[in-house]
Amino acid sequence: LTKSEEIADFPSNEVKIYLCGPTVQSPPHIGHGRSAVVFDFLFRYLKYLGKEIIVARNITDIDDKIIEKSLEQGVTYSELTKNVSKEFIQAYAALNCLKPTYEPKATESIDEIIDFIKILEEKDIAYQTSSGVYFDITRYSKYLELSGRSIEDLLSGTRVEFIEGKKNNEDFALWKLAKENEPSWKSPWGQGRPGWHICLLYTSPSPRDFTE
């Protein structure tokens, strides 16, 4: 983006906002509170301008950290995430934050996530390895558009741990194949779970509204 054009207004009265929600492996901290308050200010300001606000804030309730934490505490991942999710809801309420229009969980959107990964595979943007399915960042020209960086710069400075089969070290997991005794769901690629970066796909009953 050039930062040379002033964005005067939204093209329609309806404003759709996606907010990356919490990964619920531990209680909320001040960073979560800051994010909630900043976006709550934005929501209220847009409502003041007369805009119809549609807000999607996901809850990531399956993740490597969640699995690790549940094993540490000797509880199931679902018990852990249920309790921590309640703490987040209570924290948002204590901060007097407006509730989002949609607040779905990863585990409630497995079918939608799988369908979208299939589409990315068909477009040759996603590929399978022995550990899961990954997003090829070199196949999407707008991947770093907001950061102002280039793919070449990103790859030249990468410090991500190498995973066998990945085309680029910075490619991220869309679907992770499950290890022994890990929670998992059936998929065309084998038993596994969604990758952390796929969270946008479970933002609403119509995820495409937020992925266009």
What is each residue range found by the language model?
Residues T60, T138, A178:
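Anionic group-transfer/hydrolysis microenvironments
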Residues N96-P100, W185, R208:
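Short, surface-exposed connector motifs at secondary-structure boundaries
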Residues S130:
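Nucleotide/pyrophosphate-binding catalytic subdomain
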